[in-house]
Amino acid sequence: MKYLHTICLLFIFVARGNSRSCDFCHNIGKECDGYEKECSSPEDVCGKVLLEISSASLSVRTVHKNCFSSSVCKLEQFDVNIGHHSYIRGRINCCEKEQCEDRPFPGLPLSQPNGYYCPGALGLFTEDSTEFEAICKGTETKCINIVGHRHEDFPGDISYNLKGCISSCPLLSLSNATHEENRNYLEKVECKDAFQLARL
């Protein structure tokens, strides 16, 4: 249930979205039905986000439809190894029309540890989360660190912190993050080379 609760809140990771109307809904699974809402600046496109959190044999997916900032759409997808055999994956598709096509989730590759590691963490409602060692695998040679907060009418202010191994640095930075009247704010976006494990 902890992972289920976590993934349902992860839509805060992407900004919500001038006078365009988009579908708005959240649900567990691959599809959701909601209502149409009018977007406010700087959110200028409709979007659909699929999120997945995988831990060992357990995998849970959620879908989120909303208004988005086109700058956040540049992220397109992310696969973060947060350690303890757990991954957080997202597929973001923005479109001019109401029905956005899905970006599929390929199966996780059966990759072996590659001799690198990163700090791993997943924190919600806090910017300071307990770190542990995430052992990088396959092509994962970068460390990602994202810290921010978002204000929602419910449940209110939500802080978040995501750290782990990633294959390449995403096109997401403080310069193209949206600052919508303090609704969504990225405090830190870091992507650097992973650390090499000590050889025995």
From Swiss-Prot:
SMART domains in UniProt: LU
GO molecular function (one): phospholipase A2 inhibitor activity
Organism superkingdom: Eukaryota
PTM statement from Swiss-Prot or TrEMBL: N-glycosylated. The glycosidic chain may contain superficial sialic acid residues.
Positions annotated as glycosylated: N176
Intracellular or extracellular location(s): Secreted
UniProt keyword annotations, A-Z: Disulfide bond, Glycoprotein, Phospholipase A2 inhibitor, Secreted, Signal
Keyword set includes Nucleotide-binding: no
One cellular-component annotation, GO: extracellular region
Signal peptide feature range: 1-19
Pfam families referenced in this protein's UniProt entry, alphabetically: PLA2_inh, UPAR_LY6
Tissue: Expressed by the liver.
Cystine pairings recorded for this chain: C22-C46, C25-C32, C39-C67, C73-C94, C95-C100, C118-C143, C136-C165
Subunit comment: Homomer of 110 kDa composed of 20-25-kDa subunits.
Family, as annotated: Belongs to the CNF-like-inhibitor family.
Chain's role: Inhibits the enzymatic activity of basic phospholipase A2. Specifically neutralizes PLA2, myotoxic, edema-forming, cytolytic, and anti-coagulant activities, as well as intracerebral lethal effect of the basic myotoxin I from the same venom (AC P0DQP6), crotoxin heterodimer and crotoxin subunit B alone. Does not block the enzymatic activity of crude acidic PLA2 fractions from the same venom.
The protein's name: Phospholipase A2 inhibitor CgMIP-I
Source organism (scientific name): Cerrophidion godmani (Porthidium godmani)
